[in-house]
From Swiss-Prot:
It is found in: Nucleus. Residues 82-152, 203-276 form the PAS domain. It holds the Pfam family bHLH_HIF1A. Keywords: Developmental protein, Differentiation, DNA-binding, Neurogenesis, Nucleus, Repeat, Transcription, Transcription regulation. This is Helix-loop-helix 34. Residues 1-23 are annotated as: Disordered. Residues 8-62 form the bHLH domain. Expressed in a small subset of neurons, probably AVJL and AVJR. Expressed in the AVH neurons. It comes from Caenorhabditis elegans.
Length: 322
């Protein structure tokens, strides 16, 4: 008799628990439909924790850009809508785009992250950006994040986790397996609590596959930055024309840099051994060993090759003239 009464009491409680689960699943199903994800992604199974994380990030993003839209409305009336980021901007990026909140959590990251790093938009949204940055580069990243301004963007080169680095070229320096070097250009978002980051992957360090534009030149140095090779354009720009027999080969690269910008090269010289690749801001080089200078921006690679007879270690500069 007591057993039957106990079973009768359990039936309603089981029914109520089942009903709660059904209602919960329905609400999460509705939430999944509201998330602004690609169909291919939303069609996959996303666990409830991930759904809440994504929803929280998108609500924050909506609040930030909803306010900025209202703030910009009067300016747009006079200046047009070019003051706002549009999807067309993302199409022009040879990389991917990230928006962070004041704590450094990812509010938005473009889907092209999968092309360059093999990571997913769903995986990174709502998580801290520093969780994906090499521990030795976190201070550099945080410094750029804190000191950027709307009219004074910051740039840094950092190693970011990647699942696409397992098949590296045998001659490429792999100081940090599982990471890829990116150049980050960081600026303030619509308000002081957000940061917008354009992320560009460094070109391949295999020189034969690097396209050299007409306004660029190539210099190769030893690891102490003494020049071992310079192409014809580099000779035209850097040799002393009054001494036809002069040659920049064997000279220290530092002697060809404007002294005011030597810190740029000094920082690169230190970082290249950790990163293996580096993108500089604009700096000045001395034109034909005179008092005149010109601005360049350099993609720099450390390149090693090992054979049975020797070990070669060099640094290659592919510099574009402003």
């Amino acid at each position: 008799m007591e057993t039957n009464l106990s079973e009768e009491k359990q039936k309603p409680s089981k029914s109520q628990a089942q009903q709660r689960r059904q209602m919960e699943n329905y609400e999460f199903s509705q939430l999944a439909n509201e998330l602004p994800l690609a169909r291919a992604i939303s069609g996959q199974h996303i666990d409830k924790t991930t759904m809440v994380r994504l929803a929280t990030a998108y609500i924050k993003l909506h609040n930030i850009f909803g306010q900025s839209q209202r703030a910009y409305s009067s300016a747009d009336y006079y200046y047009g809508s070019d003051s706002l980021w549009t999807n067309n901007h993302l199409d022009l990026l040879d990389g991917f785009f990230v928006i962070l909140d004041r704590r450094g959590d990812v509010l938005y990251i473009s889907e092209t992250i999968s092309i360059y790093l093999g990571l997913s938009q769903v995986e990174m949204t709502g998580n801290a950006m520093v969780d994906y940055i090499h521990e030795q580069d976190i201070n550099c990243f945080n410094s750029a994040l804190n000191y950027c301004d709307l009219n004074w963007p910051q740039m840094c080169n950092v190693r970011v986790k990647s699942s696409l680095t397992k098949r590296a070229n045998k001659d490429a320096v792999r100081a940090s397996p599982g990471y890829k070097v990116l150049r980050l250009e960081i600026t303030m978002g619509p308000n002081t609590n957000t940061r917008m980051i354009a992320c560009y992957p460094m070109p391949t360090p295999v020189l034969s596959t690097v396209t050299i534009p007409s306004n660029s030149f190539v210099i190769i140095t030893s690891i102490d930055l003494h020049i071992t090779f310079a192409d014809e354009k580099a000779h035209q720009l850097l040799n002393n024309p009054f001494y036809p027999d002069s040659n920049i080969k064997g000279m220290s690269l530092y002697s060809l840099i404007d002294i005011s910008d030597s810190e740029v090269i000094s920082k690169m010289h230190f970082d290249i051994f950790n990163l293996g690749a580096y993108k500089t801001p604009y700096y000045r080089m001395i034109l034909n060993q005179t008092s005149e200078t010109f601005y360049v921006e350099s993609n720099i690679f450390r390149h090693t090759s090992i054979s049975s007879k020797q070990f070669n270690d060099s640094i290659t500069f592919v510099s574009s003239i402003l």
